[in-house]
Amino acid sequence: MLTLESALTGAVASAMANIAVYPLDLSKTIIQSQVSPSSSEDSNEGKVLPNRRYKNVVDCMINIFKEKGILGLYQGMTVTTVATFVQNFVYFFWYTFIRKSYMKHKLLGLQSLKNRDGPITPSTIEELVLGVAAASISQLFTSPMAVVATRQQTVHSAESAKFTNVIKDIYRENNGDITAFWKGLRTGLALTINPSITYASFQRLKEVFFHDHSNDAGSLSAVQNFILGVLSKMISTLVTQPLIVAKAMLQSAGSKFTTFQEALLYLYKNEGLKSLWKGVLPQLTKGVIVQGLLFAFRGELTKSLKRLIFLYSSFFLKHNGQRKLAST
């Protein structure tokens, strides 16, 4: 698959999947950014729906719908979707580019070896490293959008959630320090292991269950891509959930935490070890659905794009041939 083709199909598919489950993503973020009442600050200014703690995602979605209507469930969706598109475009672009370059280099290094059987594929560790490299690059581009999106999701009023107001509030609260828009970057960089685990797991599972199609996701059916996406995302989410919770706490409205270690230590001391996996069920639900849809959409988009390129090439060649005949 071409690098640009991979980036475009991956980005479009991820944006479509994000829109499909956005209310769940919104509720999940709010749940993860909640703190226990006993340790709340004296002032509730900027907190998520002051004096309210949601029991679960369903309770959160119902109450948001009652108070804000259907649009309340899509608060901050525009920025989140743009951030998702950009992050995945950059990720898939660099992942495909780095992986192809690495495999080319590896293949050249093995050309001198004789009796090599079967295709050359990266090991699980190599897939993880390649994924981390690509995800780290994407984090640098999209961290500010993630900060704005999380703030939009966790403020109470629709007025405060407006894009320009969020930008102004973050800038003012940090005394003009522009690095505040990269708050949580360290956690984000640590979380690059999440998509790395996801895509490494996807590649390994694809080789195990669909060995004949291991080099092309576009050759799998939408159902096959969906199942592999679900399984691979479940693995990565369970491993990295504490960091996901810490990132939500760092970037939420009214957050007083400055590092993910501080946020995790606070949770452990005040709410116990179990709280480090707070919201893991909605995170898993959202994650596996999005990842499943992403791989399914991406596979179908890849097939559609190839068909369009083929039709365009056929039309161009036919039209060009007719012009040459006419000129003679």
Curated annotation (Swiss-Prot):
<keyword id="KW-0813">Transport</keyword>
<dbReference type="GO" id="GO:0015866">
    <property type="term" value="P:ADP transport"/>
</dbReference>
<keyword id="KW-0406">Ion transport</keyword>
<dbReference type="InterPro" id="IPR023395">
    <property type="entry name" value="Mt_carrier_dom_sf"/>
</dbReference>
<dbReference type="InterPro" id="IPR018108">
    <property type="entry name" value="Mitochondrial_sb/sol_carrier"/>
</dbReference>
<dbReference type="Pfam" id="PF00153">
    <property type="entry name" value="Mito_carr"/>
</dbReference>
<feature type="repeat" description="Solcar 1">
    <location>
        <begin position="1"/>
        <end position="101"/>
    </location>
</feature>
<keyword id="KW-0677">Repeat</keyword>
<feature type="transmembrane region" description="Helical; Name=1">
    <location>
        <begin position="1"/>
        <end position="21"/>
    </location>
</feature>
<protein>
    <recommendedName>
        <fullName>Peroxisomal adenine nucleotide transporter 1</fullName>
    </recommendedName>
</protein>
<feature type="transmembrane region" description="Helical; Name=2">
    <location>
        <begin position="78"/>
        <end position="98"/>
    </location>
</feature>
<comment type="function">
    <text>Adenine nucleotide transporter involved in the uniport of ATP and adenine nucleotide hetero-exchange transport between the cytosol and the peroxisomal lumen. This transport is accompanied by a proton transport from the peroxisomal lumen to the cytosol. Transport of ATP into the peroxisome is required for beta-oxidation of medium-chain fatty acids. Required for growth on medium-chain fatty acids, pH gradient formation in peroxisomes and for normal peroxisome proliferation.</text>
</comment>
<dbReference type="GO" id="GO:0000295">
    <property type="term" value="F:adenine nucleotide transmembrane transporter activity"/>
</dbReference>
<feature type="transmembrane region" description="Helical; Name=3">
    <location>
        <begin position="128"/>
        <end position="148"/>
    </location>
</feature>
<dbReference type="GO" id="GO:0015217">
    <property type="term" value="F:ADP transmembrane transporter activity"/>
</dbReference>
<keyword id="KW-0472">Membrane</keyword>
<dbReference type="GO" id="GO:0015867">
    <property type="term" value="P:ATP transport"/>
</dbReference>
<keyword id="KW-1133">Transmembrane helix</keyword>
<feature type="repeat" description="Solcar 3">
    <location>
        <begin position="220"/>
        <end position="304"/>
    </location>
</feature>
<keyword id="KW-0576">Peroxisome</keyword>
<dbReference type="InterPro" id="IPR045900">
    <property type="entry name" value="Peroxisomal_Ade_carrier"/>
</dbReference>
<keyword id="KW-0375">Hydrogen ion transport</keyword>
<dbReference type="GO" id="GO:0005737">
    <property type="term" value="C:cytoplasm"/>
</dbReference>
<feature type="transmembrane region" description="Helical; Name=5">
    <location>
        <begin position="226"/>
        <end position="246"/>
    </location>
</feature>
<feature type="repeat" description="Solcar 2">
    <location>
        <begin position="122"/>
        <end position="208"/>
    </location>
</feature>
<comment type="similarity">
    <text>Belongs to the mitochondrial carrier (TC 2.A.29) family.</text>
</comment>
<feature type="transmembrane region" description="Helical; Name=4">
    <location>
        <begin position="185"/>
        <end position="202"/>
    </location>
</feature>
<feature type="transmembrane region" description="Helical; Name=6">
    <location>
        <begin position="277"/>
        <end position="297"/>
    </location>
</feature>
<dbReference type="GO" id="GO:0005347">
    <property type="term" value="F:ATP transmembrane transporter activity"/>
</dbReference>
<dbReference type="GO" id="GO:0005778">
    <property type="term" value="C:peroxisomal membrane"/>
</dbReference>
<dbReference type="GO" id="GO:1902600">
    <property type="term" value="P:proton transmembrane transport"/>
</dbReference>
<dbReference type="GO" id="GO:0006635">
    <property type="term" value="P:fatty acid beta-oxidation"/>
</dbReference>
<dbReference type="GO" id="GO:0007031">
    <property type="term" value="P:peroxisome organization"/>
</dbReference>
<keyword id="KW-0812">Transmembrane</keyword>
